[in-house]
């Protein structure tokens, strides 16, 4: 797989679980003999929702909720077949969304 690059994007609402998953991916791929760039922190998406507290009136009384999506980017340069196989067998938490591009 010479000259290829694997790009892994991780997304999660929990930054601690995201960082441990990224560290686990980097350690696994490094042990398999591939070169790793990252994890690179990408900008955090912040989604804010405004809700009226009362069901009928009192429009001045509102409540704001926010949901933050944390993202990381990992590049694997010149992946070895052993590194790809170890990536496929890796067990990661369910709250981390993983996108892999070749």
UniProtKB/Swiss-Prot annotation:
Single biological process term from Gene Ontology: translation
Protein family according to the UniProt entry: Belongs to the universal ribosomal protein uS10 family.
Recorded GO CC terms: ribonucleoprotein complex; ribosome
Protein name: Small ribosomal subunit protein uS10
Keyword Ribonucleoprotein: yes
Quaternary structure and partners: Part of the 30S ribosomal subunit.
Keyword Repeat: no
GO terms for MF: structural constituent of ribosome; tRNA binding
Its biological purpose: Involved in the binding of tRNA to the ribosomes.
This protein's UniProt keywords: Ribonucleoprotein, Ribosomal protein
SMART domains recorded: Ribosomal_S10
